[in-house]
Amino acid sequence: VYKRQVDYALKRLGVEAVITADKEELQSADKVIFPGVGEAETTMNHLKATGLDELIKNLRQPVLGICLGMQLMCRYSEEGGVDCLNIFDVDVKRFVPQRHEDKVPHMGWNTIGKTNSKLFEGFTEEEFVYFVHSFYVPTCNFTAATTDYIHPFSAALHKDNFYATQFHPEKCGKTGEKILTNFLNL
């Protein structure tokens, strides 16, 4: 579902994307978007079985992980207790509600605090992005943007050519288009 939504968002920007798991196509792509749908353990097992885990880690072009894609770029996930790609040396944690009104999964619109990541050029802190997730990445050295639900966490990560968002830019209207455009312009 989400990879099709990313494809539609890119088409609205005039970009013709190729949805593929072909290693040669991925290696020769100008940019790679790694959207995630599903559960960490199952998806990591698939990536390992197909050799895509090593390929993704060794990509040199800009890579954007979205939602589960971001989580899988981390070291370890509490979802399934699985070792992940370890691009970002940080573990993915499960949200634990602290109050009755805290609902998991976190579904909704949040503003985010940004840093100087190129992904957020022209972005104001009054803009909202859409989240739907039960697991989060704590703030860390790779945090490119933060938000707060139950407690502060990483809304986006950045290291070298790897960018990642916990939120779904493809569902965020003009704000998401701006983020995707910034990624495409890297």
Task: Give the positions of each predicted feature.
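Short, small-residue-biased leader/transition segments that mark boundaries at the very start
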Residues: 1-2
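A short, Lys/Arg-enriched amphipathic alpha-helix followed by its capping loop at the start of a domain
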Residues: 9-16
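Structural signature of beta-strand start/N-cap positions in the alpha/beta core
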Residues: 16, 31, 62-64
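Short acidic low-complexity segments
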Residues: 17-28
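Structural alpha-helical scaffold elements that stabilize or flank donor/cofactor-binding regions
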Residues: 25-26, 55, 156
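Structural motif
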Residues: 33-35, 164
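Cysteine-nucleophile active-site neighborhood
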Residues: 38-107
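Amide-donor transfer/coupling interface in amidating biosynthetic enzymes
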Residues: 58, 91-186
